[in-house]
Amino acid sequence: RIVIPVHFAGQSCDMQRIHALSKKYGFRIIEDASHAVGGRYQGQPVGNCRYSDITIFSFHPVKIITTAEGGVALTNDAALAARMASLRSHGITRDSSLMQSPSDGPWYYQQLELGFNYRMTDMQAALGCSQIKRLDDYVARRHRIAQRYDSKLAQLDVTLPHQSSDSHSALHLYPVQVDPGKRLQVFTALREAGIGVNVHYIPVHRQPYYEALGFRAGQFPNAERYYAGAISLPMFPTLTETDQDTVIRALEAALR
């Protein structure tokens, strides 16, 4: 059994408590930290796997840093690392100590299992390496933008994103909650004003694939309640104060 906590919007889940539950109920943990590269939990970088078996990061173009596509999986378990390395490259090994029969020569390899072609190119890796040097600056800039949103939206009829005291969010997103009855009106008005708002996310169990597996509306009421009023405001390091003020004025007008 595996539990996959998602560090939504860049803020870490309470991994210490989830880890305690894993010991009680006997499940493994894979952290989905796609939003949280550069974030911290209990003062330590997200991805250190103190409370999990594996942590995954996404480097999709809209994430905090990018390699154009792809990502990484981190672990402190040598056996898991070796298995992931094998699966990444078609399940092939050139390590004679892992082969099931003697090697024919230095050219020899064996496919031990049916893996995947998940190899990142050198060019993609170089792009990621160049960006990771600026990761702390990117996250710091996102925090300044979020603090400004917090201050200027405090008097509006919106619920601001919760920030946990033991998590330093990477602030991949800045999602607010509006009156569900006004969400479509607000979203449409902001889009018509040229502001790239979005909704993160449609609950997974409402997608046809999962409905075909037996999931139904009402089974996850908190997710559905959150979705009903969710709108994500623009959040990226190069967002200027002038543009941010435009977003805030448009949101204020749309809420009237």
Describe the residue ranges of each PLM region.
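Short hydrophobic "helix-edge" motifs at membrane interfaces and signal-peptide entry regions
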Residues: 22-23, 48-51, 66-68, 224-225
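PLP-dependent aminotransferase class I/II
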Residues: 2-6, 11-19, 24, 40, ...
